[in-house]
Amino acid sequence: MSGYKEAFKKAFPYTIPVLTGYLFIGIAFGVMYAEKGYSFLLAVLMSLLVYAGSGQYLAVNFFVPGVSFLQVIFMTLMVNIRHIFYGISLLEKFNKMGKKRWYMIFGLTDETYSLLCTTRIPEGVEEDKFLFAISIMDQSYWVIGSAIGGLAGTLIPFNSEGIDFAMTALFVVIFVEQWMDKKNRIPEVIGIAAAVICLQVFGADSFVLPSMILIILVLFMIKPRLEGKEDDICQ
């Protein structure tokens, strides 16, 4: 247990940006959920068992008459399909984590993935425990935010118009932090270019999957040039 205690202690400073972001977007989710007339306990339960970030924001609009089960499955897949690519890059690392790998797979979000790929393991801490601590703390921030937002939304009337932009804002902040922290920004430039091109070609509703495929293909082709230049541990 002392190993886990040290891992959580060392991991916490790295999760502070996620803490500030997840608390606010978790609160926003809770408020939106409560505005639909649902109990804040259900919002907390969803954050514990589903933990899908943008998928949960989308799910708020699914709990209405006329939305079919197939529509829910399709839209959720489209929103979260990028996680397939995240998982592929972390397969080797997760396979070394024993039973903890099942939670690591479940707890993989955009922000957690970013930390797992860019954070260097501090000395004196086991890698699997350190990465596990990051994932656990990130989800706890989301759950706490959902509880606060759900409770506040139940007790205080809110106008939630535009509140779902909080998730987009968090993505932008994390990207900017990554950009400023790196010397080699080729992968980021490729990501921006691929997204813009696919947005123009496929439209706003269908560009995510083609963008991810294009990014993976281009990075794979130029990987020999990037090796030794990039800091990411997910390469």
In which residue ranges do the predicted regions lie?
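Intrinsically disordered, low-complexity non-transmembrane regions of multi-pass membrane transporters
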Residues: 1-11, 124-126, 223-235
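Helix-loop-helix junctions within the multi-pass membrane cores of secondary transporters/permeases
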Residues: 3, 74-164
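Pore-lining transmembrane helices
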Residues: 10-105, 119, 141, 207
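Helix-loop interface residues and adjacent transmembrane-helix termini in multi-pass membrane transporters
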Residues: 37, 66, 96, 124, ...
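Alpha-helical transmembrane segments and their membrane-interface exit regions
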Residues: 51-54, 78-84, 170-176, 195-197, ...
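Juxtamembrane membrane-interface segments at transmembrane alpha-helix termini
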Residues: 55-62, 85-90, 176-181, 199-208, ...
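Membrane-embedded alpha-helical modules
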Residues: 128-211
